[in-house]
């Protein structure tokens, strides 16, 4: 994960070069950055294969990174998809379903990281994700 200095990390850390070499040698399948800025996310995708971005009902500033990924065949991992457990909506609206509908509707989304320590919540989230992903409406 980046500390927020995404561009500086990508331009000065030297980490992407050995990762690119490992990919070329077939030792890894791909590489990317878990960033915090649009500029860093775009640069990560230009130089690598994927980016991990925050995208949820409350935070959508990194949407341009998803748009770029969709148009360039790059992968996106969504972090904080459920707003760190704080996704809240009006009464009667399921915040988990609404969150999944948002993130999986974007063609740039490859996967979402959904964390929980509660097995019941995990099962419920999987069921909702499955319903959203198989929905025809």
Show which residues each predicted segment covers:
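Glycine/proline-rich, positively charged
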Residues: 1-57, 64, 74
